Amino acid sequence: MQAIAKNDIKTGTVVDLTHEGHGVVKIDRFPIFIPQALINEQIEYKIIKVKKNFAIGKLLNINTRSENRVAPPCIYYERCGGCQLQHLSYEAQLEMKKEQVINLFQRKAHFDNSKINDTVGMTDPWRYRNKSQIPVGKNEQNEVIMGFYRQRSHDIIDMESCLIQDSQHQEVMNEVKSILKDLNVSIYQEQLKKGLMRHLVVRTGYHTDEMMIIFVTNGKKWPQKNAVVEKILDAFPNVTSIKQNINDSHSNVIMGRQSITLYGKDTIIDQLTDSTFKISDQSFYQINSEQTEKLYNKAIEYAQLTGNEVVLDTYCGIGTIGLYMAPLAKHVYGVEVVPSAIEDAQQNATINQCNNTTFVCGKAEEVILQWKAQGIKPDVVMVDPPRKGCDETFIQTLLTLEPKRIVYISCNPATQQRDALLLAEKYQLEEVTPVDMFPQTTHVETVALFNLK
């Protein structure tokens, strides 16, 4: 193999893309990963890091451009780590995400008879985020800065706009930056673990336009609190809720456990199709409401509900998918380990007048065995776990339950593939549909249908 050393300048043709969207050039089968390089491009690059099994390169010049390359519309794209694919046409982004799923399920796990559908995309893949979490800091000139982190760092890129956030959020961000500066509010400095203002979090109801503004502070005492609220109301008189969240943990966790309502309601309301949901500052709620409706509609299609089925909604959160399905089911049982989420789910059931739902707090693998002992046998099980996927004990419990169908929503297809191999003992993976919940990024969600053999 050719010698490869740091700072070498080389040329080559990009033959593949990684799941992170990096171009792959190979030298005698040794891969070099190059951010922002695209398949079939002939490029010049510099080796910046060499590892045992791969190297990292920096793109210097593109000698032959891909037909899928586009000019990134965001002026911060080269520095900000929030988006990874703005240089790739949206049609090619959707195809790339489908290829990721094919690679995981067919090429690696050999689910050769399982259908992989086209990625479900957006008509307008911008301004889709209904929740923004914006770090606050100071620059070398001691000026207040707000924006998003540089890739793989906690260096804040000072911004005035973000093209994937709700447009209202950037208006709030810019106004808050001015308010913090004018009122000389203490700013948290992560390295020193001192200062007050850590993050600004903004949530909006996609269909209702209700807005919640949350100030995350390092401690409860905040001398300028009332003045800040007054200025926010002057600028945004239609704001629904203003809250202070206290996070004095000095960790990377954005929000703490305690929140105080400074103005308005404790929650905001949003809708998904015909269902209404109450959302608190800490509720888990899908970021892209438009795509969530498409995701859930595909899940309902897979569930094949006729009105006679008992549905078990595991990892149910605030009850979104369970309540979405309730009008089409005989009864929905939801289980979630987070107590506040179950409280929200129960309230959301009341709001939607769903009398055929039961929500219980606990570990799914334990609660469903209790339900089984009570004679409750689900026809359909909904699974929507966190990125780490399902606990193996849960999978084994599910295998003993033997529902007719399992509909598995995943925000991490790699762990979904791992779990699919365990489910294969008794279940046939019929098909997988990728859904683009986060355009311009490498993230892809999937919904999969498993039928009992």
From Swiss-Prot:
Binding site for [4Fe-4S] cluster: C74, C80, C83, C162
Catalytic residues of the enzyme: C411
Pfam families linked to this entry: tRNA_U5-meth_tr
Keywords associated with the record: 4Fe-4S, Iron, Iron-sulfur, Metal-binding, Methyltransferase, S-adenosyl-L-methionine, Transferase
EC id: 2.1.1.-
InterPro entries: MeTrfase_TrmA_AS (IPR030390), MeTrfase_TrmA_CS (IPR030391), NA-bd_OB-fold (IPR012340), SAM-dependent_MTases_sf (IPR029063), U5_MeTrfase_fam (IPR010280)
Biological process terms in GO annotation: rRNA base methylation
Residues given in the record as S-adenosyl-L-methionine binding sites: Q286, Y315, E336, D384
A GO molecular-function annotation: metal ion binding
Signal peptide: none
Presence of the UniProt keyword Iron in the record: yes
S-adenosyl-L-methionine is among the record's keywords: yes
Family according to the record: Belongs to the class I-like SAM-binding methyltransferase superfamily. RNA M5U methyltransferase family.
NCBIfam families: rumA
Protein name per its UniProtKB record: Uncharacterized RNA methyltransferase SACOL1957
Organism: Staphylococcus aureus (strain COL)
